[in-house]
Amino acid sequence: MPKLKTKSGVKKRFKFTASGKVKHGVAGKRHRLISHNSKYIRTNRGTSVLSEADAAHVRLWAPYGLK
């Protein structure tokens, strides 16, 4: 049986933690930030952890995990 390929979009967008949780960047931070207040920009900095329901889909698309 051939090896399963990881979806290329998943490689670019997600990382797995050591405990198996899935981290992702917060959406809506590329441009037009002048209309948002400083608190919104500050709290959406960095990464977040996906919910378990969404993480299950990502794990299907990355069969061997990501570093």
From Swiss-Prot:
<dbReference type="GO" id="GO:0006412">
    <property type="term" value="P:translation"/>
</dbReference>
<comment type="similarity">
    <text>Belongs to the bacterial ribosomal protein bL35 family.</text>
</comment>
<protein>
    <recommendedName>
        <fullName>Large ribosomal subunit protein bL35</fullName>
    </recommendedName>
</protein>
<keyword id="KW-0687">Ribonucleoprotein</keyword>
<keyword id="KW-0689">Ribosomal protein</keyword>
<dbReference type="InterPro" id="IPR018265">
    <property type="entry name" value="Ribosomal_bL35_CS"/>
</dbReference>
<dbReference type="InterPro" id="IPR021137">
    <property type="entry name" value="Ribosomal_bL35-like"/>
</dbReference>
<dbReference type="GO" id="GO:0003735">
    <property type="term" value="F:structural constituent of ribosome"/>
</dbReference>
<dbReference type="GO" id="GO:0022625">
    <property type="term" value="C:cytosolic large ribosomal subunit"/>
</dbReference>
<dbReference type="InterPro" id="IPR037229">
    <property type="entry name" value="Ribosomal_bL35_sf"/>
</dbReference>
<dbReference type="InterPro" id="IPR001706">
    <property type="entry name" value="Ribosomal_bL35"/>
</dbReference>
<dbReference type="Pfam" id="PF01632">
    <property type="entry name" value="Ribosomal_L35p"/>
</dbReference>
